[in-house]
């Protein structure tokens, strides 16, 4: 990795003459008093690395020469050179020389162009434009105070994506323009297509004109033929109908007699049916009563079955428990039997071993025969002497054995009692476990029930609140809709207004906090009546844009020009000169200051409002406005409520209609608010409807709570039963057994005391008997070499006693195991009996359930049968009722027939008369039709006769009442009857029409068709003979427009591709930098804070195009909660800013990093952390050159460069260097104290 080795300065700023500064170590600190020239050294490094003059704290390049600022330049040139060193490569020198008013760049003493110079530096990782190698004084605080938008600008500068911003905007404009051109050509093409369609229609109309004339003639013939054909058909039909009616009159008389006979028969049938219906109703009542009696029996049987099923479930549960007990007891007994067999086996093995040992010992202890005889003789003699004592001892032995047996019995009973107590303890433990489980289940169930109840309450409250809120929202929505309806404002923004709104949003986004908005959007008249007056006074300033400064305004104007927007008026608050408000005007009667009737937000736009309103006064009417304006010794600017304005100059202006239109813009603001409220209420209504739909969930929760409550009730009952019955009984029995066990102790102790007392007496008797034996066996004992005869006997019987003792132990073990085995057998038998008993109970309950189910089914079957019978009877009743109704209906019909028989006769006679009249009318109609055809010159196709045979006289006139007139009419009809018309040209469909309505419809259709054709013919003017030429012209024009549209579409596509390409390049540059910084910043912040709990994270406001909006930067200081950056302390802000600086530096890092007083705002703790971090990084990542005034910081450096001033015409900086690597750090780790 390369590093900055030396800096050579000549006549640069405060450095007079030539000075070589260095060498620079990996971590070098520059120190010195204020004003000594430390920052000038940093400026020198910046200068040689190509920094702009404006960032070097001078106005012109010449001002960088020593003494130039005071008018005494030390020379006409100055330069700074830098020696850059890399491992394994030659040192390179970069120099920048001030010659006259320009810079000259050199690499290794060779003059190069600026771009070559920059490229070489970029190869080393030094980016001049991004300034990734230095941090100026105050830059840390500046970064800490940056807002998200300024942070984005910083990233744009670092990533160099900002270089593409101008191209990005240009491509975007080209894309938008190309899309607009495409849309324009599309609409143009659409209009020409409409013209082409119109030309086609003109040609088609000319072709149709002649065809329509021919159609009219054919339609006239068809209509007349249709009328005549159906007239003749109707005449023929009427003749047949007349003959038919005469026959019907004869038949009607015979039908009347038959109807009377039928009526009598129907009356008899109806009487029979009604009697049957009454019988069925009686049977239905009986079955209904029977069913009401059977239902309770079925319900009772069902309840018995349900109850028995529950008992069966409980019995099965008990059976399972007893079976578990039985299996456990059986296992215990098997273990005891195994133990018994083991003891018996051990006893047998012992007996066999003793037998073998006794045989071997018997051979060793055998006396001589004479000695044996002597022993037996002496033994007999001793027995005789101690006979009394032996009898007394025998009596003691008998008593002792009896007491020992009694002691063994008591101890056996004690063991049995202890076993029973253990059994009861097991049962009590089982009861307690069951109680614990039940209590645990009850507790859990209660908690669950409480949760369910709570949930039910919450859901109920939520649903009820939702219902109430829905009603409220609907009322509010209705009110809003009414208000919107009353407003009757249909605002459709023009593209011009939309464009202005877009530009307004853009400059607000570009200059957040500096652009406040349009004046009309920031203020509102206090009352509606003032709207017109305020509108008049504000005038063109209504749409003026308020900004904080003149610079912001000029920047906005430049932006609008670039966007080709319309001219806008800006009111910069720092530039406006406003006269103070005349307080005396507030005392005038009948007038108010216009500024006093306007509400505005934010408060600091008041200056702009004062500028727009001045000292203008608003009055209620024109007279007051004129009086106050011109009536006093001093003129005032006044306005009436109707908008009449009186200027001080005497000019009076109105324009009420135009003002009202402008004033409506105040109302439009209210309408916008109403629309926003409507949208908000609609969204809330959707949310509340979702909550209301939780009713189904509420019902489910209620059902679950009910089920849980029932199970809890049963569990509590079971718990109570277990506590009060099973546990209490077992505790009582255990207490009784413990009482019995307590009585065994005293009895056993009493027996033991008696046995011990008797043993002492027996011991005294034995001692007396021993004295007798010693006297008798004295000589014999000397002979065999023992002290006394007992020693001989004990030696012989000792073995037997040990064997007897061992045998007794085996016997006791067998006795104990036998007792336990007998007890377990008894308990096992009890368990087996209980299992058997529960099996019998289960079997019995199952049999009873089977019987009860059969009984239930039997009752159900009876009910089903009864219900089926009842339903059958009801069906019969309905059928019979229907039959009776039908019969009544039939009788009613017969009565109607009979009652109307005479009327029918009269009716038939009337019909005959009517038919004759119709026949006469049809003949008259035929005559009129033929006469009309002759008069209208409609050529009818005739097969017999000619058009001349048609009479010109009127036929069937109402005035003709004489016999001669009738005869003449009949003669005309007879002559015209000879004319036969050829209906071959008449369509068959028209001939087939039969019904009068159908004939009328067809006739109307033909007439309508004829009328339409005639109407169309009348409307159509003479055909356009140039229609074809026009069509050809329009087709050519359409093709031309289509080509233009296609070309515009391709241009739009190309423009979009170009825009997307530059957008992608800009995004890639920005995102590469952002992702690198965002990835590293948390780790760097942790390292700076020396605490892994510290957190730092970056987030773009616009992830799609992050360079268009701000970047949020947040830190969580160690041991603290999350707080916004503004709420962090000064030191925390500085550490956060340093983390961001180092993270930015990690993206395309420069080999060295020059930092000017970054520790200014840090306390000692944070200084140590930052210094240690820089020291760590300088060893492997970058060379650090830091200007610092704080000892805690620069003592961590590897070398020091001291800058001190010498006074002259201006300050002269001198430099000292000091290598700290020779002096090891006494405390390398600041955390180790």
Curated annotation (Swiss-Prot):
Function statement: Involved in chromosome cohesion during cell cycle and in DNA repair. Central component of cohesin complex. The cohesin complex is required for the cohesion of sister chromatids after DNA replication. The cohesin complex apparently forms a large proteinaceous ring within which sister chromatids can be trapped. At anaphase, the complex is cleaved and dissociates from chromatin, allowing sister chromatids to segregate. The cohesin complex may also play a role in spindle pole assembly during mitosis.
Which UniProt keyword terms apply here?
Acetylation, ATP-binding, Cell cycle, Cell division, Chromosome, Coiled coil, DNA damage, DNA repair, Meiosis, Mitosis, Nucleotide-binding, Nucleus, Phosphoprotein, Ubl conjugation
Q: What protein name applies here? A: Structural maintenance of chromosomes protein 1A
Give the sites modified to Phosphoserine: 358, 360, 957, 962, 966, 970
Q: Where in the cell is it found?
A: Nucleus; Chromosome
The text the record gives for the protein's domains is: The flexible SMC hinge domain, which separates the large intramolecular coiled coil regions, allows the heterotypic interaction with the corresponding domain of SMC3, forming a V-shaped heterodimer. The two heads of the heterodimer are then connected by different ends of the cleavable RAD21 protein, forming a ring structure.
Q: Where is the composition biased (Basic and acidic residues)?
A: 284-293
